[in-house]
Amino acid sequence: MNSLISKAFSAAKKEDRPALLTYTVAGDNTKKKSLEILKSISNYVDICELGFPHNTPIADGGQIQTSAYRAIKNGIKINDVFSIVKNFKKIKKNKPIILMGYYLSLIHI
């Protein structure tokens, strides 16, 4: 398979370096700022990972839990996460992005 993710790992391997992936919680700060943050970090990484905020992120560390709570407090919804990705891919169509979330959040879509 020749996905953007496999291409990113192949490019890093050719350069004899590890691939750099970053994670940010969608909606942390604001929806608009979340897109700006994602665009900004994408300039320096191989793959972006964007998390769906969850109200009980027990499997995450403290910093991600706090980010998720802020995002929820700011009104982020699951459809907003997809909107952020859609707008991001309009600008950075060749940058791989991985979505991460809890199964229980996603089955209710």
Residue ranges, per PLM feature:
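Glycine-rich, proline-tolerant flexible connector loops at the mouths of alpha/beta enzymes
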Residues: E49-I76
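N-terminal amphipathic alpha-helix/helix-capping segment at the start of soluble metabolic enzymes
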Residues: M1-L21
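Active-site beta-loop-alpha junctions enriched in small/polar residues
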Residues: V25-G27, P53-N55, M100-L104
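Conserved small/polar residues in nucleotide/adenosyl-binding loops
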Residues: I107-I109
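Surface-exposed amphipathic alpha-helices with a cationic face
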Residues: S10-K14, V85-K92
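Hydrophobic faces of well-ordered beta-strands that scaffold small-molecule active sites
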Residues: L20-T22, C48-L50, I97-G101
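Glycine-rich anion/phosphate-binding loops
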Residues: D28-S42, G75-S83
